[in-house]
Amino acid sequence: MSGLDGVKRTTPLQTHSIIISDQVPSDQDAHQYLRLRDQSEATQVMAEPGEGGSETVALPPPPPSEEGGVPQDAAGRGGTPQIRVVGGRGHVAIKAGQEEGQPPAEGLAAASVVMAADRSLKKGVQGGEKALEICGAQRSASELTAGAEAEAEEVKTGKCATVSAAVAERESAEVVKEGLAEKEVMEEQMEVEEQPPEGEEIEVAEEDRLEEEAREEEGPWPLHEALRMDPLEAIQLELDTVNAQADRAFQQLEHKFGRMRRHYLERRNYIIQNIPGFWMTAFRNHPQLSAMIRGQDAEMLRYITNLEVKELRHPRTGCKFKFFFRRNPYFRNKLIVKEYEVRSSGRVVSLSTPIIWRRGHEPQSFIRRNQDLICSFFTWFSDHSLPESDKIAEIIKEDLWPNPLQYYLLREGVRRARRRPLREPVEIPRPFGFQSG
């Protein structure tokens, strides 16, 4: 029977243990003890390590006791002692009985080796557990230390924030106090500056008294006059505003109704052109214009075919008179224009078309009557310096041109009975202006 026949397989374990007998080795043979220890180490190395398993190696049986009995194994079951080897895939039992020639001292030495190994393993396990306990304690201590440090840091941060807020409040309070102190100092300085010396106080009081006496002597008239002038100026400003609004509204109405009138004026002109001597009769029947028409002027007015009065681009800037003539023996012009323009300064400037007179028919510039110089009608076209020039233009524009029919029918009314009376024109009181035509 070979040594391997006694191999005994057991269930795999997580740890390996060494089973030894209860025999205590003696010091009989130190050499045998060392040899047995070397064999045990070699057997341990040769055993293949397994996955959590253990191998049991049987040691040589101890020698019989002195009483002649059979020695018992460690478990009390008898038989061969075994060594469980760490790292094996199974339990290998090597019976010591296979080696017949081994002395009893070898069993004692092997037992001592196994006991020493068991003690070292137990010490190792206990040392490992103690090391783990020490490591855990150190780890817990480090964690506690870190937590305490974090709490201390938070407390420190909170204290710093509180201290910073307190410092800021203290600084702001100091700034406010400094500002109040400076303000008080400035007020005291101003009070000191405002308080004049005693001599100056007397002079100021004397000046105030003199001023009051002067006011009493003047009386309440300036005050009442100022109270009256202020409302008067306010009323005048309001009146100017209303007048400006009225002027704008009047100009808008003039443009509007001027366009509406234009159609009727064109039809009227067409009819008047077919009435011989219409404008000459109207001029001669007018009570103011008739004084300027004498002799040759009346003959020349017989050739007037039409008259137009037109305003310039802006109603208040001026107007234009157009006289249309047919061929006549007195002058060559078929159209004579007289224009009045109001400048920005308010001055009225007149311009006219030069009359081309035929030879020997130049009119007399003035007619002497009752020691007065009276402007001739045709002189009105060429002479712009006489005051009567503007008066003629205003009469034609404001009176004759709006309704020439009433002056034409004056002479006709003398010769025939009129069916209805003429309606007197309504004069609108306004400054020198021009109607649309």
Curated annotation (Swiss-Prot):
<feature type="region of interest" description="Disordered">
    <location>
        <begin position="1"/>
        <end position="81"/>
    </location>
</feature>
<dbReference type="Pfam" id="PF00956">
    <property type="entry name" value="NAP"/>
</dbReference>
<protein>
    <recommendedName>
        <fullName>Testis-specific Y-encoded-like protein 1</fullName>
    </recommendedName>
</protein>
<feature type="cross-link" description="Glycyl lysine isopeptide (Lys-Gly) (interchain with G-Cter in SUMO2)">
    <location>
        <position position="156"/>
    </location>
</feature>
<dbReference type="GO" id="GO:0006334">
    <property type="term" value="P:nucleosome assembly"/>
</dbReference>
<keyword id="KW-0832">Ubl conjugation</keyword>
<keyword id="KW-0539">Nucleus</keyword>
<dbReference type="GO" id="GO:0005634">
    <property type="term" value="C:nucleus"/>
</dbReference>
<feature type="compositionally biased region" description="Basic and acidic residues">
    <location>
        <begin position="28"/>
        <end position="40"/>
    </location>
</feature>
<dbReference type="GO" id="GO:0005730">
    <property type="term" value="C:nucleolus"/>
</dbReference>
<dbReference type="GO" id="GO:0000785">
    <property type="term" value="C:chromatin"/>
</dbReference>
<dbReference type="GO" id="GO:0003682">
    <property type="term" value="F:chromatin binding"/>
</dbReference>
<dbReference type="GO" id="GO:0019899">
    <property type="term" value="F:enzyme binding"/>
</dbReference>
<dbReference type="InterPro" id="IPR037231">
    <property type="entry name" value="NAP-like_sf"/>
</dbReference>
<comment type="similarity">
    <text>Belongs to the nucleosome assembly protein (NAP) family.</text>
</comment>
<dbReference type="GO" id="GO:0005654">
    <property type="term" value="C:nucleoplasm"/>
</dbReference>
<dbReference type="InterPro" id="IPR002164">
    <property type="entry name" value="NAP_family"/>
</dbReference>
<dbReference type="GO" id="GO:0042393">
    <property type="term" value="F:histone binding"/>
</dbReference>
<feature type="compositionally biased region" description="Polar residues">
    <location>
        <begin position="11"/>
        <end position="26"/>
    </location>
</feature>
<keyword id="KW-1017">Isopeptide bond</keyword>
